[in-house]
């Protein structure tokens, strides 16, 4: 089979205005970024059409280093729905450069189920990440300047909370000291970098309903505390308007196309392990304004992306998914059943059977939200008929719909069974109205504990002294009504990446808490999760090159 990049180059792309017109967007509303990419104004959102559209969330079993293929399944499902005559649009997140050049490689789907132009989407795309990075670091520069210019007046901050961001994986930037040298270099202070997908600006962009809401949220960003324990925000700097200007284009959703020429919105890119893991509300609603079926995904496993999709994105936006599709692979399930990474391509029925406990736990959790769930098995060439039969029988025993997804190798034709299952389930057994894991009026501890115990399976929740002090500040600020966004490893229900499967009865430790006052959520950091990843021993960058003007190695 051809490589992803070879398949992408073999597709004869439609002009982006043709793609827009195919779903009902007028040509004059299309702002071209080249021939095959466009920005679409969010003013085209029609809330009445949003209510009538069928929103489908695609999530997955707990992530493994072998990959699950959630984005490929999401794109494939949209292709399959279009194959059976439904007007379907996929709405995804933008890839981050860090993982593209690190361990993961590209994030535009795979095989014959990709969003295109793949190279541009995986690299700089429309510059949204650049704008977010610039806006975030502009706040850092303006804050440092404010402190430098006002130090003679005796003004200072007891604690500076605002860090910097870059869209790279660079462990050496996690903790730094700025302002070294002469006094003219600024105030010496500890700082550090997070990766751009963990930026509060990224979360704000993805949760804002319009430019005015974007500005309001930026104004509320908490930068630090004064010596008399008063919050110091972007509003106090007086630069919310300037920062919003940097994002005036980035807030518009991006329109591209799939390998079969159907529409795809790709906008926003928070990670699900260290942020809330969902594409922008605006892009989702724009897709729902023009599509009868909209397929969206949430990052990593259902314990991370799906939980945050329901408890944060849907709570903030009023969105109600009609169905949740959970993606599983035989390889991933075998790994959760105790099979080592180097042996998961070999037949192992016992390992597969044990790994099904991970799938079962995710399905129980998804049902706790009132969701109707169906399973998509992303088929790999090494999967055996016996393994597929075990998976089918298991789903039948659970009373869960099941279909095999072959979109990677066959495009939309390989997802027709999945598409028919989705349509039939929505028509005959749609999800109930969402039931959130916690109430707005619950305390921060109650919210964390309900997620950790009810969804992860923890039995004891512990807090560092830093986390406890942060909670006191949150209570003092009167923002306990914010939802919680738990940052933890993607490889386990617990905070320990080495514990696979369906672990229960463990201690769950909250190391720190970050107040995202602009994004209006509380980020609780569990275990040793880092908001600036590092590069692996053999980064994907070693395999990326340009030969005769053509990019090689992106996948």
Curated annotation (Swiss-Prot):
Entry's family note: Belongs to the formate--tetrahydrofolate ligase family.
Protein name per its UniProtKB record: Formate--tetrahydrofolate ligase
Secreted recorded as keyword: no
Domain of life (superkingdom): Bacteria
Pfam families named among the record's database cross-references: FTHFS (PF01268)
Binding site for ATP: 64-71
Alphabetical list of CDD domains matching this protein: FTHFS
Reaction catalysed by this enzyme: (6S)-5,6,7,8-tetrahydrofolate + formate + ATP = (6R)-10-formyltetrahydrofolate + ADP + phosphate
PROSITE patterns in UniProt: FTHFS_1, FTHFS_2
Encoding gene (name): fhs
InterPro entries (alphabetical): Formate_THF_ligase, Formate_THF_ligase_CS, P-loop_NTPase
MF GO annotations: ATP binding; formate-tetrahydrofolate ligase activity
Keyword Signal part of the UniProt annotation: no
Keywords: ATP-binding, Ligase, Nucleotide-binding, One-carbon metabolism
Record EC number: 6.3.4.3
Alphabetical list of Gene3D superfamilies matching this protein: Domain 2, N(10)-formyltetrahydrofolate synthetase, Formyltetrahydrofolate synthetase, domain 3, P-loop containing nucleotide triphosphate hydrolases
One GO BP annotation of this record: tetrahydrofolate interconversion
SUPFAM superfamilies from the UniProt entry: P-loop containing nucleoside triphosphate hydrolases
Enzyme superclass (EC): ligase
Pathway given in the UniProt record: One-carbon metabolism; tetrahydrofolate interconversion
